[in-house]
Curated annotation (Swiss-Prot):
Subunit structure: Part of the 30S ribosomal subunit. Contacts proteins S4 and S8.
Compositional bias of kind Basic and acidic residues: 14-23
GO biological-process terms attached to the record: translation
Name of the protein in its database record: Small ribosomal subunit protein uS5
Species whose genome carries this gene: Frankia alni (strain DSM 45986 / CECT 9034 / ACN14a)
Comment on protein domains: The N-terminal domain interacts with the head of the 30S subunit; the C-terminal domain interacts with the body and contacts protein S4. The interaction surface between S4 and S5 is involved in control of translational fidelity.
This protein's encoding gene: rpsE
Function: With S4 and S12 plays an important role in translational accuracy.
Keyword Ribonucleoprotein applies: yes
Keywords: Ribonucleoprotein, Ribosomal protein, RNA-binding, rRNA-binding
Family: Belongs to the universal ribosomal protein uS5 family.
SUPFAM superfamilies per UniProt: dsRNA-binding domain-like (SSF54768), Ribosomal protein S5 domain 2-like (SSF54211)
Length: 202
């Protein structure tokens, strides 16, 4: 009988270890979640002596939907590998986007090759009024209310990089006031001033 008790106790210990392993694996698997958008996938060919070698390129936008975004370009023989390379490249080029609430601080224009993108602040509830490539960048950056217009090139690569150039050109009202030597009240949006007056901050 004592032997049976030992076997039962061993089984219970094993069950407890399994439960600990299962419960302990959860937090270890939790990682920072990023929003990923594949903007364009193209098949390209390289002409070599034996013929043509095909591969794929992927333009990917990655962000945390909270003011951080990056763009990457990946190339590989398979589409999933190209996307994975694009994601890693985008993470290497993360930058912060100044925001006021859910919109941008001021109108801004970005250019890349023949592509031009105009961005304007919008009131809460407006949404992202933009085409596919521009929308992908703004959503990954966490800009939820904005008006945009694309001019010139329709190439998604140019449009995405023009959007990034526009976002990089944004400045917070405090920076603008310091550069111009003006009080913050002269350059800050009314909504920001009301929020500060109410003690909510920005």
């Amino acid at each position: 009988m004592p032997g049976q008790q030992r076997r039962g106790g061993g089984s219970g210990g094993s069950d407890r270890r399994e439960r600990r392993d299962r419960s302990g694996g959860g937090p270890a698997q939790e990682k920072n979640a990023y929003v990923e958008r594949v903007v364009a996938i193209n098949r390209v060919a390289k002409v070599v002596k034996g013929g043509r070698r095909f591969s794929f390129t992927a333009l990917v936008v990655v962000g945390d939907a909270d003011g951080t975004v990056g763009v990457g370009y990946g190339k590989a023989k398979e589409v999933p590998a190209a996307i994975a390379k694009g994601v890693e490249e985008a993470k290497k080029h993360f930058f912060k986007v100044p925001r006021i609430g859910s919109t941008i601080p001021h109108p801004v224009q970005g250019e890349e090759a023949a592509g031009v993108v105009l961005l304007k602040p919008a009131s809460p509830g407006t949404g992202v009024i933009a085409g596919g490539p521009v929308r992908a960048v703004l959503e990954c950056a966490g800009v939820h209310d904005v008006l945009s217009k694309s001019l010139g090139s329709s190439n998604p690569i140019n449009i995405v990089h023009a959007t990034v150039a526009a976002l990089r050109g944004l400045m917070r009202p405090e920076e603008i006031a310091a550069r111009r030597g003006l009080p913050l009240e002269d350059v800050a949006p009314p909504a920001m001033l009301r929020a500060r007056a109410a003690g909510a901050g920005v």
